[in-house]
């Protein structure tokens, strides 16, 4: 909606619940996500990577190891998933990102020949998993007071 109401340059951050079919130790059927978008002239994937590094380093410190993997999201092109190396030595996906698909821009009456954008979605529960060494994301929703009391 924000892209329909404003003209570039524009930037938005929003948060909310996301629903999907996944349910395992690293995926929930409902999770909380912070999303961001930035649209202006000449926005590049290099700018997106720089922003992601700044976000991750601000959350976990400069010593955290991360990697970008090619991925697919219909609203970004190209798309990537970003993984962080956990304390246990396993890679854990923490966010999805990419350059805004030109079709999305055009559908918002933004000239995709003049403007481009970047977007990302960051899972809040994943941040908590990594910061606190939690191995099963479902623990956050089991009502186990012994587990939950450590997060006061």
Task: Name every feature range the model reports, one short phrase each.
Residues 1-152:
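TRNA-recognition modules of translation machinery and tRNA-sensing kinases, especially anticodon-binding
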């Amino acid at each position: 909606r924000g892209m329909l109401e404003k003209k570039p340059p524009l930037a938005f951050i929003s948060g909310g619940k996301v629903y999907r079919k996944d349910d395992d130790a690293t995926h929930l059927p409902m999770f909380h996500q912070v999303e961001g978008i930035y649209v202006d002239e000449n926005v590049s994937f290099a700018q997106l990577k720089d922003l992601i590094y700044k976000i991750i380093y601000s959350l976990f410190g400069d010593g955290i190891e991360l990697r970008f993997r090619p991925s697919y999201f219909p609203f970004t092109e190209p798309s990537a998933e970003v993984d962080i190396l956990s304390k246990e030595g396993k890679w854990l996906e923490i966010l999805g990102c990419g350059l805004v698909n030109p079709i999305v821009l055009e559908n918002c009456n933004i000239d995709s020949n003049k403007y481009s954008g970047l977007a990302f979605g960051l899972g809040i529960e994943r941040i908590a998993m990594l910061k606190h060494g939690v191995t099963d994301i479902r623990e956050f929703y089991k009502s186990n007071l012994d587990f939950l009391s450590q997060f006061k």
